[in-house]
């Protein structure tokens, strides 16, 4: 794990720490970007061969055990005995519920819109996160930084619409109902709220990050275990697991733990840049591994994201 002191911020620290921070962000971009291509690789007859709920539960449980091991290794167990209370731990239940709600909402809303419409409109979560970041955390963005957020939204929309050569491959008509539009707006709001709330909780409590993760993932395991048991899953817990699936699990475990570092020591806006950059990695890996054809317009979102990074951080 990349160690960053609780009293240091990446922007105002030594060159060595900035280099570690950059490495962490690049690693996150790679993990995020490789997730969808890896899922495609493990599909059989266009279907995911394993239980999605068991996979999520396994990921949450792994993050919980790693957080506990990290807490033991840091020698902060005595702090844990002092810090355990409902007042301290209960705020971490909110992100678990919000993320679980959104995971189910994504599946539910597919009946009210086509996948392409969802992919395009889900980029509005960038705007919702930025708005909640300024209103709930009291942070102020300059005009050029707001413009950078607009560039990220534009990059996501243009990438979804124009980067892939889908001629002759579109199987469903483009449509969205008024109910579907409302649901996708709720999805974007909840996504932003979960990110901003998590950042606020992590930064407001002066506790070791491993301890905060322990609280966070305990609730994550409880919520996802309840979801798995109530879902009537027909497949065995590890049925359909291949080497690629285990790579996905390991990647998502690392992704969650590293993203908590970003939320603790960076900002939710940094998370948005990671996710936006990851869609470009996703496209390149899909082209290289899956043979997906890219159009010349792929360079347009690349330029927009690069411009957004320059405007926001300079």
From Swiss-Prot:
Lumenal side: 42-54, 110-145, 197-206, 264-267
A GO CC term attached to the entry: Golgi apparatus
Topology of the protein relative to the lipid bilayer: Multi-pass membrane protein
Catalytic activity: CDP-L-ribitol(in) + CDP(out) = CDP-L-ribitol(out) + CDP(in)
GO molecular function: pyrimidine nucleotide-sugar transmembrane transporter activity; transmembrane transporter activity
Main location: Golgi
Protein name: Probable UDP-sugar transporter protein SLC35A4
Gene that this polypeptide is encoded by: slc35a4
